[in-house]
Amino acid sequence: MKLLLLNILLLCCLADKLNEFSADIDYYDLGIMSRGKNAGSWYHSYEHQYDVFYYLAMQPWRHFVWTTCTTTDGNKECYKYTINEDHNVKVEDINKTDIKQDFCQKEYAYPIEKYEVDWDNVPVDEQRIESVDINGKTCFKYAAKRPLAYVYLNTKMTYATKTEAYDVCRMDFIGGRSITFRSFNTENKAFIDQYNTNTTSKCLLKVYDNNVNTHLAIIFGITDSTVIKSLQENLSLLSQLKTVKGVTLYYLKDDTYFTVNITLDQLKYDTLVKYTAGTGQVDPLINIAKNDLATKVADKSKDKNANDKIKRGTMIVLMDTALGSEFNAETEFDRKNISVHTVVLNRNKDPKITRSALRLVSLGPHYHEFTGNDEVNATITALFKGIRANLTERCDRDKCSGFCDAMNRCTCPMCCENDCFYTSCDVETGSCIPWPKAKPKAKKECPATCVGSYECKDLEGCVVTKYNDTCQPKVKCMVPYCDNDKNLTEVCKQKANCEADQKPSSDGYCWSYTCDQTTGFCKKDKRGKEMCTGKTNNCQEYVCDSEQRCSVRDKVCVKTSPYIEMSCYVAKCNLNTGMCENRLSCDTYSSCGGDSTGSVCKCDSTTGNKCQCNKVKNGNYCNSKNHEICDYTGTTPQCKVSNCTEDLVRDGCLIKRCNETSKTTYWENVDCSNTKIEFAKDDKSETMCKQYYSTTCLNGKCVVQAVGDVSNVGCGYCSMGTDNIITYHDDCNSRKSQCGNFNGKCIKGNDNSYSCVFEKDKTSSKSDNDICAECSSLTCPADTTYRTYTYDSKTGTCKATVQPTPACSVCESGKFVEKCKDQKLERKVTLEDGKEYKYNIPKDCVNEQCIPRTYIDCLGNDDNFKSIYNFYLPCQAYVTATYHYSSLFNLTSYKLHLPQSEEFMKEADKEAYCTYEITTRECKTCSLIETREKVQEVDLCAEETKNGGVPFKCKNNNCIIDPNFDCQPIECKIQEIVITEKDGIKTTTCKNTTKTTCDTNNKRIEDARKAFIEGKEGIEQVECASTVCQNDNSCPIITDVEKCNQNTEVDYGCKAMTGECDGTTYLCKFVQLTDDPSLDSEHFRTKSGVELNNACLKYKCVESKGSDGKITHKWEIDTERSNANPKPRNPCETATCNQTTGETIYTKKTCTVSEEFPTITPNQGRCFYCQCSYLDGSSVLTMYGETDKEYYDLDACGNCRVWNQTDRTQQLNNHTECILAGEINNVGAIAAATTVAVVVVAVVVALIVVSIGLFKTYQLVSSAMKNAITITNENAEYVGADNEATNAATFNG
């Protein structure tokens, strides 16, 4: 019976950020799966009858299983191959009859599960096969064997009509759980064939061949003395990482950090023991290492050897305290090609330490936490494997929209999940596309509610796009709701969106929370009455109820994959670790010394699928059913009945004890008070050295160690030999002081004690500052303004008094120089009088960066703005002065004393300037006096009254004729009152005048434009404002910015409109065009053929003037700044420009013998390979050099002969007879030749003399002669190929 074999790899590891896809496998993604996600792909072979289901997202662990069936003479055989590309074997070495053979690296192998369709229970009538709609696609239900209940395929078939052309839609497990495949892969037989040819046939058993170069940064932040030695010893394992090009150590000492560069060979205990980490948070070290690694990775120096270029930075952080700041792993490390691996000593499993350390990592299995000395070896081994695997070459993460498969090809995930519509996978482009392609089928609809309108967004679901009135939340912690969502006219209500604690807060209490209407964040409201207490073991936890009461409950453990459907397994909490584990239900034994490490428990066909445990011979076991624990603290381990549930162990210098009353364990220190200290049998050793040594515990043993500075005791020093005997040595007279190089002198004190002092030479004229500056490690040690020293003759060292150094200072010629002091940006501005006024913007040192002052009063009465202040002094109330600053300024970084971005620093100076604008307030403004020398306050209504002869009043900042005036204007034409008297009776009438209410504003516009244009040539004048009569009375100035939008047909030369109207001159604003065509309109860019997306091309604006005086412009390529046609560095490479980055890409020219020399036979070509000549770039033949196994020469006809190097009578290639005329014999000449050139010349001479028409042979040797001469000219010492593998592979005959 033909079986459908579904081979699934159940992996649990971290995924590359590139491969993080939303989980789509309902059954296998019960948790976060170690922060990674499941993703994989199905493929089928139509001809060879195998199925492949392999996980790609777990790259670089490239691992999958093939099951293939073949039928020979009616006998069917199926073989299973487990393949891991990081560690393949030769295909011819595979024993196909051994189906249990697994030739992967064991450390990267994963459990395999086999699923089968139960064809006996599948209807033979296709019409009876049930169809099911799964994710918008019609699938068919098939019975399956345990642990499956059913499998759903997208093809209808029976056992008689089954086909290989199907996709899996879903798997239903016994118990109700299922795996749903939410997208479907395109069938692609070519992909499988290529994979089979290029991957399974790869025969190199080399772990590191696919690893990239890296630089290793190790940050020492673990100070616990009980584990330091083990760490230093085990870190030597990292020296096996062959692609590490350098190592840098980072560590704290007091308030200073230090770095040390070592080679990979020096990464061992003897080197690391010299450097001890000081206490403190390692945050600054991480930032320094990050910057150092980013610089190395970004270094693309053209003169650097390609074999030495760093592709990925690797940072190892050793820490035992929580970080002081948070890091964003993706932006700060991943995108800079830096992988961070953390090794955390967390004895008490403090969640704060775990949480802060996890913020550093995101790629691969990079987090390693341990609690004691006995876990160091396993932790560093896991670290080594994680680093090695992570150094595997990957696809370009910026170009690949999917992720990498085992051949570094870009493909897409199995789970192309989209919450809003159905998807399918396009394996050619590596992207997930909507399904069906023409009209994607919606997965979720989002109807409107009384809150507002909704739309579906991937990973978010239905989200509000537009709130109805009263529904917009006022602050973040409020959420709108309605009593009846379907009533679209109901008024929204607001409620707090704050959840109470489910677990106690860090202070140990349960809290409820309420919404803070001021900040928008949830704040603590009510605290529980009592602190959480009462836990007695690691398998208990605190929980909070709705009344903020705390209680203790046992941890509930749930079985995880692949154990869920395995009835023999149960989920148990490990009392030692507090972690849930999947264990066999009958396994109640734990080892306690003896010759075995555990009991043998099984649950399979051999035990009738029942759980059964057998003790191993010579094993010592404790049975938890009998309340037994193992006591390892004595001479030999032994089981004992105890109220405690944890084994009693030693961890370094700590011993775990049990309090039988409270049923809890506690730690106590190892007692070393009885350890004896031995001194040499002389008259000084014990007297001088006794106070400097004491007993202590180190790595679980009582040892004697120094407790003070034993290098300076009396007039000598103390040391402990390999026999642990302490001896005093008197060496004062041979010592030199650390500073000043003064001789030591032994003196006796008043208390009869001796000391070695280093008094200054009496003949020396140097001061303490001079002496100490030479041996100081401080920056700028000789600058006595900030550093003063005192020489201490007792120690021969110096004490320094350090004053705070100036901000933004550097050391030049031995002195601190302030780089930002008195720096100012010089600026000019043209004011209303048409004159240029100079002003200065000071620069300040902020966070060690010299930036323009962040706030400036542009009308300040100071030295920077004095002239502008005086100009506007008469009417400053009507002047709006604006300080323009870069939009890239980060206020948060500024307040947190962090540096600004590089982008900000590039534009900061250019973007800092002041602008001035005169405004009108209550019909008063600032205006030039008639002499145009200064400004004064002007009452516009008074001016109107004066000019018009009628009374004006201010209304809404517009001057209108007094509404009580009898003669109101008509269409803004002013009327005056005419009084006539006749017979003593006065009559009042209105008379038209030539004046209008627009006259004043028209004059303002005219004067402003005249002042702006005066004395300037080539000023573009496009008017964008005019006066408009409103309501017969008012005549304001109305601007029309539409006139300032660049008309595609109007050419203003190398100037372009900005779309803004100047509020003073009422003329359109222009920007000057120099070298940035993006500022110009698309019309003129297209006309000049500008390619904005081509970084290889730089442009310049060229202006011309026609005979009619019309100015036009065009964009020309700036040849000096462009990189359109880069030149190759030598004839054997081509040079092209990357249009995205503008950088030059150099590609080596390649050639093959069969293409360049088509008449050469494979046998002749066996001795030669093709390469490019650096003289002229032509293809030339090069003869192979000798190797350890092969020796090459030519016979008289030029035929290639390959000989066994150890037995030169044995020819390794096919022998070809050479037939030449009898009188020609140049074998002796060839044998005597010492270079390839001489050999070839001898052969050619023979052939020319004979002239027997052997054209192919002649072409071979004549070409070879040309090459030999070329090679000789280039390099007198001829170098052949490196190995016979290359020799055999490069000729393509």
Curated annotation (Swiss-Prot):
Topology within the bilayer: Single-pass type I membrane protein
Subcellular location as annotated: Cell membrane
The keyword Transmembrane is assigned to this record: yes
Parts of the chain on the Extracellular side: 16-1234
Record PTM text: N-glycosylated.
Residue positions the entry lists as glycosylated: 95, 198, 234, 261, 337, 377, 390, 468, 487, 643, 659, 890, 992, 1138, 1204, 1214
Chief location bin: membrane
Cytoplasmic topological segments: 1256-1293
GO MF, any single term: carbohydrate binding
UniProt keyword list: Cell adhesion, Cell membrane, Disulfide bond, Glycoprotein, Lectin, Membrane, Signal, Transmembrane, Transmembrane helix
Cysteines engaged in disulfide bonds, as pairs: none
Residues spanning the membrane: 1235-1255
GO annotation (BP), single: cell adhesion
CC per GO annotation: plasma membrane
Signal sequence residues: 1-15
Assembly notes: Heterodimer composed of a 170 kDa heavy subunit (hgl) and a 31/35 kDa light subunit (lgl); disulfide-linked.
Function recorded in the entry: Lectin which binds galactose and N-acetyl-D-galactosamine of host glycoproteins and thus mediates adhesion to host cells. Mediates adherence to host colonic mucins, an essential step for pathogenic tissue invasion.
Protein name: Galactose/N-acetyl-D-galactosamine lectin heavy subunit 1
Organism this protein belongs to: Entamoeba histolytica (strain ATCC 30459 / HM-1:IMSS / ABRM)
